[in-house]
Swiss-Prot record:
Keywords, in A-Z order: Chaperone, Cytoplasm, Nickel, Nickel insertion
Region Disordered, annotated ranges: 163-214
Function: Involved in urease metallocenter assembly. Binds nickel. Probably functions as a nickel donor during metallocenter assembly.
Single annotated GO MF: unfolded protein binding
Protein name as catalogued: Urease accessory protein UreE
Length: 214
């Protein structure tokens, strides 16, 4: 097992580091650690890269971020990525009183359900953590007539970074901070302060109008 004591840096914050990773990728030496969103706040974890390298990681920051570099040397490098998530997407109409009111009401509804939410411009994203019919029933009546809805596969970090909004969930943990092994589920209890410049690619599953169901 390769031990990782802290993060080297983040490729989206450091152009020189990003350039080094591109060089490793071109040479076939870049390894990826794909995490579930729930793993990002663990202080210690044991994972395997897509190349099969076993890593024992001690995290030296509040949470892992997409683009964090776990190790970098002449022979190889490893970077953190997150699994994609399916989201219920609401495209709101042009800004106006109706749109603002709808966005506020959608935020309240999502918060009441303790779901995550992210907002980019006039688009609202809610990860599919419940039955799709339930999500549509809870949110549908608060979507303006000129708004549209769809489902899309999005980068999970969308719900972690600066676009994410509080969901009302208490993210505190009950575990004591002693004797944690790499595999134990110990989460940092910190606010999110994550900013990166990569795009969130949306692979649309289907489109539908929010008023198409009863």
């Amino acid at each position: 097992m390769r031990h990782v004591d802290g993060v080297v840096g983040n490729r989206y914050d450091d152009p020189d580091l990003d350039e080094q990773l591109h060089a490793h990728e071109d040479a076939g030496r870049l390894e990826r650690v794909v995490l579930e969103a729930g793993q990002r706040k663990r202080s210690r974890l044991r994972v395997e890269t897509d190349a099969g390298t076993d890593l024992g990681i001690v995290v030296d920051q509040p949470e892992l971020r997409a683009g964090d570099v776990l190790f970098l040397d002449d022979d190889a490098a490893a970077v953190v990525e997150f699994e994609s998530r399916t989201a219920f997407v609401v495209d709101l109409p042009s800004p106006g009183p109706e749109t603002v009111a709808a966005a506020v009401e959608l935020g309240h509804r999502v918060g009441n359900q303790h779901w995550d939410i992210a907002i980019e411009g006039g688009t609202v994203y809610v990860p599919v953590e419940a039955d799709r019919r339930i999500i549509e029933d809870v949110l549908g009546e608060h979507i303006p007539d000129s708004g549209t809805t769809r489902y899309a596969s999005v980068d999970a970090s969308l719900f972690i970074g600066e676009n994410a909004e509080p969901s009302g969930v208490d993210h505190s943990h009950e575990a004591t901070d002693s004797g944690h092994g790499y595999g134990e589920d110990h989460d940092h209890d910190h606010s999110h302060d994550h900013n990166h410049d990569h795009d969130h690619n949306h692979d649309h599953d289907h489109s539908h109008s929010h008023d198409s169901h009863e």
